């Protein structure tokens, strides 16, 4: 018998122990028996595999109570189901693919006890790789896009958790933090692709009164992590795409760990989709047959006005979008797919990734309120920026270094060195960065802690729409961004290419804030 379907809004668990960690949240109309029926599409346990490739399910939610989210997160390598296959040697959190979603509100405290239980069956090194072997057991956590401290027990990338080690991540979400989709994932340099590519990632959603309003209107809110999965030739061992088997044509394109799930809508229904490109390197050009999207937020930050009638959505690795989808009145099956995209070196093929099934009675619900205006962002293009706060960040490729080896990719002429800081920025200032790309491929550029505003692409001004933490720097081109340092001193604050193998090969650097 198939386990009972559990809607994300219902799946908030009270005192339920999941893979060695206690999930503390308020139960929402579920008995204990109902709660333990975890949809298999999350990769939770082998006996639930029958639900793979069926209706889209979402990872279980760990929700804050009384202003605090307290939970255990265990990173391990126990086999899980991925896209309907039993996968050996994943790297998952709490045995789930994707990991549990952390659901918090501005002002909440996040208190995670993180345990490293990574065990690989086979020794595996790559000669000349110049970075840790893929079987290294060291790991940590990065809270991608979250505007929290880069030091201490928060988003500190110098923290390393060794095998069988533990780390407490304890920090507060600022009271003025924007509502939207963020994520957490492994971030040890040299191992990022290997761990994230095998599943070490989960979503974070920051909710506020705007989120509550959408819920009261009866509008369904779906969270979707878009991923690629690669398997060895025997189709059982999950591997990453860091040179082991990195042909985009061989990847399984997954949503919430499922292969070609069904997304159900009623005729005329409005839904909100929060989308995360949680892949290590893929560029997704998302298209829904017969429908258009309305974009209301990018990288967890609301736009100043919605982008309507968008036939496609472009998401590079690490990017998020929140979109409104309105089903048309014609019942039937519509394909959600990726258009082909030429990144310069890799070409990501056209692929169907889900079926949207429109059926049943016509939907009766409220109108979506549009963009969230509770946390407005400032247009930095009009700010006065002195010459000394204009900086250049050069993304380059050293062709003398073989493909796959450390030093292949660089920023400002050098590969990642944790002891080298580019500069120290001053709290309260606005800086302008020219980010150049002299390589033959597009690079998604990501900055930790502080979002930025793109003001130019290839020297041409860009109209103000909002702030983001990932932006594509076009091949042989540039972007110009501005960023304001409003909180948090210290560091390190990292910036890097979010093609994670490029980061692992050196395209990352750091700065501090004082």
Language model segments and positions:
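Extracytoplasmic beta-sandwich strand-turn segments characteristic of Greek-key/jelly-roll folds
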Residues: 102, 133-177, 295-329, 416-425, ...
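Extended terminal and domain-junction accessory segments
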Residues: 14, 26, 31-72, 76, ...
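Short solvent-exposed strand-capping/beta-turn motif centered on an Asx-Ser/Thr pair
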Residues: 115-119, 276-281, 436-440
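Short, hydrophobic/aromatic beta-strand segments
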Residues: 121-130, 137, 282-289, 443-447
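N-terminal, post-signal-peptide metal-ligating segments of extracellular/periplasmic oxidoreductases
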Residues: 2-24, 30-168, 240-273, 303-305, ...
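Histidine- and aromatic-rich segments of cupredoxin/plastocyanin-like copper-binding domains
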Residues: 150-155, 160-162, 230-375, 462
């Amino acid at each position: 018998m198939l386990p009972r379907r559990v809607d994300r809004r219902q799946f908030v668990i009270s005192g339920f122990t999941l893979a060695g960690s206690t999930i503390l949240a308020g139960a929402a109309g579920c008995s204990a028996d109902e709660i333990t029926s975890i949809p298999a599409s999350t990769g939770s346990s082998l006996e639930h595999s029958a639900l793979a490739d069926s209706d889209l399910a979402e990872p279980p939610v760990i929700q804050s109570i009384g202003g605090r989210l307290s939970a255990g997160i265990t990173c391990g390598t126990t086999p899980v189901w991925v896209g309907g296959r039993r996968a050996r040697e994943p790297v998952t959190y709490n045995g789930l693919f994707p990991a549990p979603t952390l659901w918090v509100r501005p002002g909440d405290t996040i208190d995670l006890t993180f345990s490293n239980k990574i065990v690989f069956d086979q020794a595996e090194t790559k000669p000349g790789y110049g970075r840790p072997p893929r079987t290294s057991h060291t790991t940590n956590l990065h809270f991608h896009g979250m505007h929290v401290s880069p030091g201490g027990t928060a988003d500190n990338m110098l923290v390393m958790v060794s095998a069988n080690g533990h780390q407490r991540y304890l920090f507060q979400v600022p009271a003025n933090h924007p509502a939207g989709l963020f994520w957490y994932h492994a971030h040890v340099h040299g191992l990022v692709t290997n761990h994230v590519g095998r599943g070490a990632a989960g979503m974070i959603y920051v909710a506020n009164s705007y989120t509550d309003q959408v819920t009261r209107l009866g509008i369904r809110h779906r969270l979707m992590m878009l991923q690629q999965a690669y398997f060895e030739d025997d189709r059982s061992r999950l591997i990453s795409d860091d040179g082991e088997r990195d042909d985009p044509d061989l990847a399984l394109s997954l949503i919430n760990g499922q292969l070609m799930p069904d997304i159900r809508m009623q005729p005329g229904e409005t839904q909100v989709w929060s989308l995360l490109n949680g892949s290590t390197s893929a560029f997704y050009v998302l298209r829904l047959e017969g429908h258009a999207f309305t974009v209301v937020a990018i990288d967890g930050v609301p736009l100043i006005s919605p982008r309507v009638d968008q036939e496609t959505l472009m998401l590079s690795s690490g990017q998020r979008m929140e979109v409104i989808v309105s089903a048309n009145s014609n019942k039937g099956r519509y394909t959600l797919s990726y258009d082909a995209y030429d990144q310069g070196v890799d070409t990501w093929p056209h692929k169907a990734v889900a079926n949207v099934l429109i059926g049943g009675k016509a939907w009766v619900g409220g109108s979506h309120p549009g963009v969230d205006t509770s946390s407005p962002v400032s247009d930095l293009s009009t700010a006065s920026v002195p010459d000394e706060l204009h900086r250049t960040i050069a993304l380059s490729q050293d062709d003398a270094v073989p493909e796959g080896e450390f030093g292949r990719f660089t920023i400002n002429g050098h590969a990642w060195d944790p002891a080298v800081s580019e500069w120290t920025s001053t709290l309260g200032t606005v800086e302008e960065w020219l980010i150049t790309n002299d390589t033959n491929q597009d690079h998604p550029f990501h900055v930790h802690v502080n979002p930025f505003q793109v003001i130019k692409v290839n020297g041409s001004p860009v109209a103000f729409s909002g702030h983001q933490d990932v932006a594509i720097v076009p091949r042989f081109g540039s972007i110009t961004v501005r960023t304001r340092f409003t909180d948090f001193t210290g560091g390190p604050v990292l910036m890097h290419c979010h093609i994670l193998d490029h980061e692992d090969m050196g395209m990352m650097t750091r700065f501090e804030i004082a």
